């Protein structure tokens, strides 16, 4: 079993959802970002999504757009992001780590080279937000052939006719974007989330993670009662933006992760 399969199976036995945390590689700088990354599992993160900085993150709201700018201004590249995963893996062989971002940097890096290096450093999955199922041959199938999960996004506007196409070839888990729009937007109602999870379960046996708009331990707990995973990104990245310095940013992100983890663990 893959690290993602193992983690979700373990949490199912514990009857709780996974806390999935998103941070951008290189934000606020390389050293602080690596410190955050290494600290997240102990703070309660069950799965980590690591953003690959890009100049035009069109699906992301202001918080993550600014995180991309901070990281790129600090010299973060795709090669340095893969190096960061390697350094993380040297001390953690169990926590699943998923790279999330856009196809353009991967295309410029070289798809074959990227997949080979991602596999070597210990990447477990990919979320590439601007690569629809019609382009599975470009990255999804080669990644899966190398043993890297390809995680699909579904949204409130993904209809029942489209869902099987989106889910075909998906692996690891399904990421349900609970608000149609950019990351960090207002949260969806719990009733809406419950209906969406039920609809997705009719189409897939994969674990379902819910993201976009989750900002507090209480909200994370409420979503954790409905889904297999609770994804939090913008709320963590806001802590970096508001911190007085990078050392404070590390502390604040890990503190919020701890609060969210407590909410998720006490949800059921």
From Swiss-Prot:
<feature type="active site" description="Proton acceptor">
    <location>
        <position position="60"/>
    </location>
</feature>
<comment type="function">
    <text>The alpha subunit is responsible for the aldol cleavage of indoleglycerol phosphate to indole and glyceraldehyde 3-phosphate.</text>
</comment>
<dbReference type="InterPro" id="IPR002028">
    <property type="entry name" value="Trp_synthase_suA"/>
</dbReference>
<protein>
    <recommendedName>
        <fullName>Tryptophan synthase alpha chain</fullName>
        <ecNumber>4.2.1.20</ecNumber>
    </recommendedName>
</protein>
<keyword id="KW-0028">Amino-acid biosynthesis</keyword>
<comment type="subunit">
    <text>Tetramer of two alpha and two beta chains.</text>
</comment>
<dbReference type="Pfam" id="PF00290">
    <property type="entry name" value="Trp_syntA"/>
</dbReference>
<comment type="pathway">
    <text>Amino-acid biosynthesis; L-tryptophan biosynthesis; L-tryptophan from chorismate: step 5/5.</text>
</comment>
<dbReference type="GO" id="GO:0005829">
    <property type="term" value="C:cytosol"/>
</dbReference>
<dbReference type="GO" id="GO:0000162">
    <property type="term" value="P:L-tryptophan biosynthetic process"/>
</dbReference>
<dbReference type="InterPro" id="IPR013785">
    <property type="entry name" value="Aldolase_TIM"/>
</dbReference>
<dbReference type="InterPro" id="IPR011060">
    <property type="entry name" value="RibuloseP-bd_barrel"/>
</dbReference>
<feature type="active site" description="Proton acceptor">
    <location>
        <position position="49"/>
    </location>
</feature>
<comment type="similarity">
    <text>Belongs to the TrpA family.</text>
</comment>
<dbReference type="GO" id="GO:0004834">
    <property type="term" value="F:tryptophan synthase activity"/>
</dbReference>
<keyword id="KW-0822">Tryptophan biosynthesis</keyword>
<keyword id="KW-0456">Lyase</keyword>
<dbReference type="InterPro" id="IPR018204">
    <property type="entry name" value="Trp_synthase_alpha_AS"/>
</dbReference>
<keyword id="KW-0057">Aromatic amino acid biosynthesis</keyword>
């Amino acid at each position: 079993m893959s690290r993602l399969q193992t983690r979700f199976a373990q949490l199912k036995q514990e009857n709780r959802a996974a806390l999935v945390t998103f941070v951008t590689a290189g934000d606020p700088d390389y050293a602080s970002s690596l410190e955050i990354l290494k600290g997240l599992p102990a703070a309660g993160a069950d799965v980590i999504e690591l953003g690959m900085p890009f100049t035009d993150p069109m699906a992301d709201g202001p918080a993550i757009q600014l995180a991309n700018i901070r990281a790129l201004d600090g010299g973060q590249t795709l090669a340095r992001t893969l190096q960061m995963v390697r350094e993380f893996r040297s001390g953690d062989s169990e926590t699943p780590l998923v790279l999330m971002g856009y196809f353009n940097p991967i295309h410029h890096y070289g798809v074959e080279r990227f997949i080979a290096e991602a596999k070597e450093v210990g990447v477990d999955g990919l979320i590439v937000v601007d690569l629809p199922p019609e382009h599975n041959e470009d990255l999804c199938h080669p990644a899966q052939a190398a043993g890297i999960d390809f995680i699909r996004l579904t949204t409130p506007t993904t209809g029942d006719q489209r869902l099987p196409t989106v889910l075909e070839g998906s692996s690891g888990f399904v990421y349900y974007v609970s608000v149609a729009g950019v990351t960090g937007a207002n949260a969806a109602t719990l009733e809406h989330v419950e209906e969406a999870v039920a609809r997705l379960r009719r189409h897939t046996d994969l674990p379902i993670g819910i993201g976009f708009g989750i900002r507090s331990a209480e909200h994370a707990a409420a979503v954790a009662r409905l889904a297999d995973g609770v994804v939090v990104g913008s709320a963590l990245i806001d802590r970096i933006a508001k911190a007085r310095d990078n050392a404070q940013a590390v502390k604040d992100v890990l503190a919020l992760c701890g609060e969210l983890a407590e909410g998720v663990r006490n949800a059921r």
